Amino acid sequence: MQRNTYNKVGLYILSLAMLFVFIIILTAKIPFCFTSDCSFIGLKKLVLTNIVPIVCFVFFLFSIYFYNRLKNITKYNGQDSVKITSCQSESYESLTFLATYIVPFMGFSFEDMQKNIAYLLLVVVIGIIFIKTDKYYANPTLALFGFKLYRVNILHPGSGETKNLIAISNDVLKVDDNVYYSFFDEFVFIARKKI
């Protein structure tokens, strides 16, 4: 159960990777000087004026870690496979997440520390809601890297048919494909087409 929650939190952080990059671009204050009388402002001042971009950079590094973890997750199960009996694209969910939760942050001001704390709390609350409602799979960052979402029914030789699941895959899936799988929870799994 803890691994499932860890994976869900990781997918949510990964879904915010673009937001972290945009915030870094919007808020980084790195002084540039092209004259001969330039001097370094000091590491302490540089860090204190760039707290928000530094925090976003750390979370961006976490998102890279979770992306690499996700890419390798189906290697845990290279033996057991299921057959897809019904398949429908759900990739529009990524655009919904992008338009609803990431784009509005672009207009926010990050100058006031109280607002930054409120923004952080908002992102945490949205993450909790996404994880509790199992919408954490709607991930625009994965869409950029070629992952697709599918609503599928699967047939497992030992346990029969399971309906209405979400498959996340880098492959194009269709009915009658056999896929290796690794479940995040009861309804969402990573799929890799069996060759």
Curated annotation (Swiss-Prot):
Organism phylogeny: Bacteria, Pseudomonadati, Pseudomonadota, Gammaproteobacteria, Enterobacterales
Superkingdom classification of source: Bacteria
Transmembrane residue ranges: 10-30, 46-66, 117-137
Keywords: Antiviral defense, Cell inner membrane, Cell membrane, Membrane, Transmembrane, Transmembrane helix
Knockout or disruption consequences: Cannot be deleted in a Kiwa-containing strain of E.coli.
Localization (cell): Cell inner membrane
Known function: Component of antiviral defense system Kiwa, composed of KwaA and KwaB. Expression of Kiwa in E.coli (strain MG1655) confers resistance to phages lambda and SECphi18.
GO terms under cellular component: plasma membrane
InterPro entries per UniProt: KwaA
Topology within the bilayer: Multi-pass membrane protein
Gene Ontology process terms (BP): defense response to virus
Protein's name according to its UniProt entry: Kiwa protein KwaA
